[in-house]
Amino acid sequence: MDVAPERLARWLENFAGRHGPWTADGLLLTAEDGATAELAPPPGSPGTEDLDELRRAAGESRRIGLLLARKGAVAVGVADGPKLVVSKVDTHYVQGRTAAGGWSQQRFARRRDNQAKAAAADGAGIAARLLLPEVRTLSALVTGGDHTAVDTILAAVPLQPLAALRSDRFLEVPEPRKTVLEDAIAQARAVRILVKDPT
């Protein structure tokens, strides 16, 4: 589950209310009834194994880059804290699969592949225009959508400084649109918590 940094203190209170008092061993909380909660810092925050440090760092405002991509669409933005300050969304037509067989199927597959490559090249261009000028101010690059599309975009040589900032957190998002990009900010800023109830 993802918890907004400003709601973390309340979540910890509720965890204690549901499972009893807890003790912390680094970022692993163990409650009286045996339930555990493992916390992961948000992308771009300093790595820590201390709960109080995590609470402080998670609440700090950070600039993060966002790159959401699927085969025919890309959304790129910069968030300063919870606010989207720069963004660009672009779509490309990429033909779907066809039921035709033989030469037609191969021709359509080549066309689809060429359309996907053109969309990725345009996505890399947008990422370069929006994110490269900001690269020194970004604490992380959070990606999402389709792994192959994102990896293809970030494989562009000029984007290597961005690839170095890429967070392990990968967001599951639908077709990238501006509203999807705005919603992704909350996921990118959140403290990720894995709760295991007692058996």
Regions of interest found by a model, annotated:
Residues 1-199:
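Terminal alpha-helical anchor/extension segments at protein ends
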